[in-house]
């Protein structure tokens, strides 16, 4: 009996400890929108950590802050009406300095450092950031390639080599280079976030066992939800076992999603083309992408789906289904194996294989680039199956464009515009093997006089039940150094 009582006391002691609450105002935070509250917030986190864990509460109010340093076994709870505000750097005060990284040459500055953030954690476990409040990153810098000095923050949330992390129910606004940079994080759950920012939304880099669901991400100047596998950790690590489901990505003018205005007038993206906003695998791809499932997602006023490996990683076993897109500014589907090779010397070219894309509906897509599947000479993309695809393109392609030569550009940054206008109206495939396209219907808002499909160095292709809705349809196939495709009704 005494033994049972002892264990019950231990259990309730652990339960109370794990559910201890720490109000940031009790540690000196004012929440008045003027005072810098990060010292008080960090004191509350330290107290919770010393107690063995707990919940750090932000009541309603605005909390200007510099770097907030997470600890293990901590929940950050932003209550309704609370705003965690990224403060503007001053000569006297600012964010934590970017930590040294001897592998920084393999990726941009923004991917190489984690401490120069509004909220950051490293080598932690059991961390939750949640609540109905807002993270406002107004004071963060949005640059990525240029080195930023001490005191300048460029990410809202950065996590490195952590496990058992949950992000839920937050709203995030203007969050610098990344709303979230998670690198080397295992067992990561991201649910019901609303993000309206001026660069990347969710960057999931070298992570394993990730669940992204029910998120709304508006990123006109960069990618919305993006999986990466850089070399910033100093070793190769795949991003694997990831599901992305029930999400909405867009490229509306920044701040207009959370405000409900959904304004489409905005300057072009940093690369000189139309807004981003999409779901993408890549560009950083020293490691690989394996066992990825993307389903039930909507793209609006943004670029299309992109699957890219250009730094030596393997991209394989990818399943994508039930996708709808509207007002798409470049290729609805872009699959690229390239040779940029931002990896240690001697890293071989990567691979792409076993890709399945099913049940995709696209309306009002830019016709310049068509759907693109492009490997490299002697490095074929393999085993791609695209089925139940309906696309309505803008059209407008000319007969003269049908003779355009598509450059290889093996080392160039991967975007559809790297190839210029494509000589096919629906699909261009190059350096690929075992490609199957079935149950496809393609229409054009204005006539397009380019051939429908161009195959270049393609082996073992099958086209089944492909319908082209266009009067005076031009040639269906153009073949260059390719096997004759099997065409089935």
Predicted regions mapped to residue ranges:
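Extracellular/periplasmic carbohydrate-active domains that bind, remodel
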Residues: 17-489
């Amino acid at each position: 009996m005494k033994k049972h009582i002892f264990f019950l006391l231990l259990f309730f002691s652990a339960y109370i400890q794990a559910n201890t609450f720490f109000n940031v105002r009790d540690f000196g935070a004012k929440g008045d929108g003027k005072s810098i509250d990060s010292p008080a917030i960090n004191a509350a986190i330290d107290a919770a950590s010393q107690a063995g864990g707990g919940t750090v509460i932000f009541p309603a109010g605005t909390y200007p802050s510099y770097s907030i340093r997470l600890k293990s076994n901590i929940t950050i709870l932003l209550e309704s009406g609370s705003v965690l505000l990224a403060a503007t750097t001053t000569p006297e005060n600012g964010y934590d300095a970017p930590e040294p990284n001897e592998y920084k040459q393999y990726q941009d500055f923004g991917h190489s450092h984690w401490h120069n953030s509004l909220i950051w954690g490293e080598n932690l476990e059991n961390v939750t950031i949640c609540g109905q409040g807002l993270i406002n990153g107004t004071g963060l810098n949005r640059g990525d390639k240029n080195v930023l000095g001490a005191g300048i923050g460029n990410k809202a949330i950065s996590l490195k080599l952590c496990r058992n992390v949950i992000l839920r129910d937050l709203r995030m606004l203007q969050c610098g280079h990344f709303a979230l940079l998670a690198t080397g994080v295992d067992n990561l759950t991201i649910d019901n976030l609303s993000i309206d920012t001026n660069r990347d939304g969710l960057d999931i880099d070298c992570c394993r066992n990730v669940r992204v669901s029910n998120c709304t991400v508006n990123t006109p100047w960069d990618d919305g939800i993006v999986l990466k596998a850089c070399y910033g950790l100093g070793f190769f690590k795949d991003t694997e076992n990831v599901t992305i489901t029930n999400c909405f990505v867009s490229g509306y003018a920044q701040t207009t999603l959370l405000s409900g205005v959904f304004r489409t007038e905005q300057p072009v993206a940093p690369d000189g083309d139309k807004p981003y906003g999409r779901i993408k695998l890549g560009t950083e791809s020293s490691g690989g992408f394996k066992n990825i499932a993307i389903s039930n997602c909507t793209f609006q006023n943004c670029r299309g789906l992109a699957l890219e490996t250009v730094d030596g990683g393997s991209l394989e076993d990818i399943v994508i289904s039930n996708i709808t897109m509207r007002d798409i500014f470049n290729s609805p589907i872009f699959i690229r194996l390239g040779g940029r090779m931002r990896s240690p010397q001697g890293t071989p070219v990567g691979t792409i294989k076993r890709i399945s894309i099913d049940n995709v509906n696209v309306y009002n897509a830019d016709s310049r680039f068509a759907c693109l599947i492009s490997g490299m000479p002697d490095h074929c993309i393999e085993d791609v199956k695209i089925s139940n695809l309906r696309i309505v393109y803008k059209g407008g392609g000319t007969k003269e464009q049908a003779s355009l030569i598509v450059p290889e550009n093996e080392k160039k940054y991967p975007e559809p515009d790297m190839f210029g206008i494509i000589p096919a109206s629906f699909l261009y495939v190059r350096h690929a093997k075992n490609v199957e396209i079935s149950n496809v219907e393609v229409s054009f808002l204005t006539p397009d006089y380019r051939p429908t499909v161009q195959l270049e160095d393609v082996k073992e292709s099958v086209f089944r039940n492909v319908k082209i809705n266009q009067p005076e349809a031009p040639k269906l196939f153009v073949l260059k150094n390719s096997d004759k495709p099997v065409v089935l009704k």
